[in-house]
């Protein structure tokens, strides 16, 4: 079964009211997404979605005629294009979806996984006051969620600490993860990053509160700073959601000594790369646990990878209602991915990633 064509479709989904993401200085009034369709010569299709795919024609030229089952070669070709251009990993993910459909197997099983569900942590997106965050966390707990991730974005962490402390005190049933949002910046955002001393002081406060992990308290490339944090504090340190290469992820594990490395399969390394990084993490007694904030398809791809590779008890699920509801997150999908009453989440049953786009339903949002 050979690859015959690669098609892309662009969409823009309006966000009204706007989403006030903690990591973005500008309100988000829409979300753009690209769906890639990889077709084989027998008519089987595979789908994935993420950011724009400006290299579609180049990838199509390099991949047409390739054996779709030779996913390592597909991965290698995407990697060579990624080096020179943008993040093209949704093509590799779509090929895995195609293979799953051809073999009538879910992707997590193709990847060697043996389970179909995993505990979810609800990943918040907005900055809100302590009372509102406690209210939202209590509602999530009552719905079965076992863990939440809280965002902050203040230069002075003391501004945000009362929110974290309130959740730990008033919703003690939840594991709490904290994202400092210092790893990277949005285009044009020149806000200074924390230094190692600031991050260490904050880490000690979170350790006192029993926080599960501290995520991205330093710039992603500050390997010496991460190593000092890892060796100087007792809390798990997580990083690497936006790395470009496997080498960067590997360096965070080895030189940076982070406990959790977080490359997103649709942004860095695809599913083959995730497996390699996860195995390295396991050998070092650490874990790979993916970032999943793109869209519903991105969450789905990372969920399949987590089922196969992750040794973390949780997987990230973007969910912060009413600002970021499951319906808002999954507008691109024909189904909504729900967290069960026992706190677990699964892909939809079926082959490949488990869903195929309903192009008629989302045609109203198409822009290209």
Which residues make up each language-model segment?
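Metal- or metallocofactor-binding catalytic centers and their adjacent structured scaffolds
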Residues: 5-7, 38-103
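Shared catalytic-loop signature of beta/alpha-barrel
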Residues: 66, 70-73, 219-238, 243-344
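Conserved, mostly hydrophobic/aromatic
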Residues: 3, 43, 59, 91, ...
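Metal-dependent enolase-superfamily TIM-barrel catalytic cores that perform enediolate-based chemistry
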Residues: 117-233
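Glycine-rich, aromatic-flanked loop segments that form ligand/cofactor-binding clefts
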Residues: 92-127
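A cross-domain feature marking catalytic cores of carbohydrate-active enzymes
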Residues: 50, 122-125, 150-152, 178-182, ...
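Flexible C-terminal active-site loop/helix
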Residues: 2-15, 24-27, 33, 41, ...
